[in-house]
Amino acid sequence: MTKILCGSIAAIALLASSAAFAQVKMKADITGAQEVPPTTTQGKGSADVSFDPATKKLSWTINYSGLSGPATAAHFHGPAEAGKNAGVAVPIPNQASSPVKGEATLNDNQAADLQAGRYYINIHTAANPGGEIRGQVTK
């Protein structure tokens, strides 16, 4: 009986620890209306984001269309709640054409801010150098 109980406890602990470090799936709907201040644009996009708490690896696939011109830059910004601006936290390279895929390793503070919903994706153009479309990253 003791062996069965110990084995059951070990299995539960293993499942609990693997669940605690499972990939966290997030998303962002990216529009001009979310820019601060809002922009008038036909541009829109979406992002599928995943985060591995064990390795702190952030991965993304971003799709966008309808911008006023080519994307000149893209970043994860934070920490900031929706409706607030913040500096660049993670650059998004190769943003010139959609889809954009990439990954980065975050530090502890960045990981905490991301998981708390305090990161947003911003895509910039020449006509809107402060950002043409933006979307808060949420679970």
Which residues does each predicted region cover?
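Metal-centered catalytic cores of metalloenzymes
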Residues: 2-8, 12, 17-74, 78-139
